Regions:
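N-terminal export/assembly segments and adjacent metallocofactor-ligating motifs
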Residues: 1, 11-15, 29-274
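Acidic, glycine-enriched active-site microenvironments
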Residues: 6
Length: 274
């Protein structure tokens, strides 16, 4: 409920006024309005505040409709504000939401870079708190879905950020490195270290082969036909959007040059392609 972008109005069976739907359990008799005029305007106001916590030079640039996914603007947007310098460029939920809401981002709010060092000491992933909008998704999925509680709100010079409760590394905090926080992060604040800057050109639905559970995954493949990212399928019956550290990060064996890519059969002591 920290970002409050899921605000709705209850016509029947719920509390009055706009409420964050993610904090209210579903009950019989509820009638919910998700797109009333007041609710839509409130969401836009909330979004305006959220992007003030994130580099948004490209989001409210008047040339956004003419800008391609790989263009680098040298006239209107500073280096630190550009979407192309973010590892989640063109797969950023924040940008997608701005486009979906058709927002007119003539905001007077400015983003001040926090100059927080990139956290790279933990294995397999990186944390950039300069891109965090403190939506609390990572904290909630770690606590409520994974039951881990490795992430928590922290304070830095009076500003709320995300970290560990005791200021330790994630490895020391008991993190399972399942990657659930990365999957729910709407910005580039939490990303996989491997293939961080690689862009996917196609997606494939497959099943994780590390164990017999049968977790369904969406695999992202780059233009060189390398597997660069695995995202758990939230609609799959076996895993319901979750994965273990092997399923999320154990991908490099697929890209190995020594990997067998065709079936072989041994005949007279010699292996031959079938």
């Amino acid at each position: 409920g920290a970002c409050r972008m899921c605000v709705v109005e209850f016509e029947e069976g719920g509390p009055p006024g706009q409420q964050a739907s993610c904090t209210i359990p579903v009950a019989d008799g509820m009638v919910v309005n998700t797109k009333s005029e007041d609710t839509t305007e409130l969401r836009k106001g909330i979004m305006d505040l959220l992007i003030s916590e994130h580099p948004h030079g490209c989001l409210n640039c008047h040339r956004i409709d003419l800008c391609g996914p790989a263009d680098i603007c040298l006239r209107h947007v500073s280096v630190n504000d550009r979407c192309v310098t973010c590892p989640k460029n063109e797969r950023c939920e924040l940008k997608d939401t701005v486009r979906y809401m058709e927002m007119d981002l003539d905001t007077t709010l400015t983003y001040n870079n926090r100059h927080i060092p990139l956290k790279v000491k933990d294995p397999m992933w990186e944390m950039d708190m300069n891109l965090c909008i403190v939506c609390a998704r990572c904290v909630r999925v770690c606590d409520e879905v994974r039951g881990d509680g490795a992430l928590a709100f922290t304070d830095r010079s009076g500003r709320s950020l995300i970290g560990t409760s005791n200021g330790t590394s994630l490895l020391e905090s008991g993190c399972e490195f399942c990657g659930a926080c990365i999957d729910v992060c709407p910005t580039g604040a939490l990303v996989e270290r491997d293939h961080k800057w690689d862009k996917a050109v196609k997606k494939i639905t497959s099943v994780c082969t590390h164990c017999p559970v049968g977790c369904q995954m969406t695999l992202e493949v780059d233009k060189r036909n390398r597997l660069i990212r695995a995202i758990p399928d939230r609609h799959a019956a076996a895993n319901q959007g979750q994965a273990c550290f092997k399923g999320k990060f154990g991908l490099e064996f697929v890209n190995s040059k020594a990997r067998l890519r065709k079936s072989l059969i041994k005949t007279d002591g010699e292996l031959a392609e079938t």
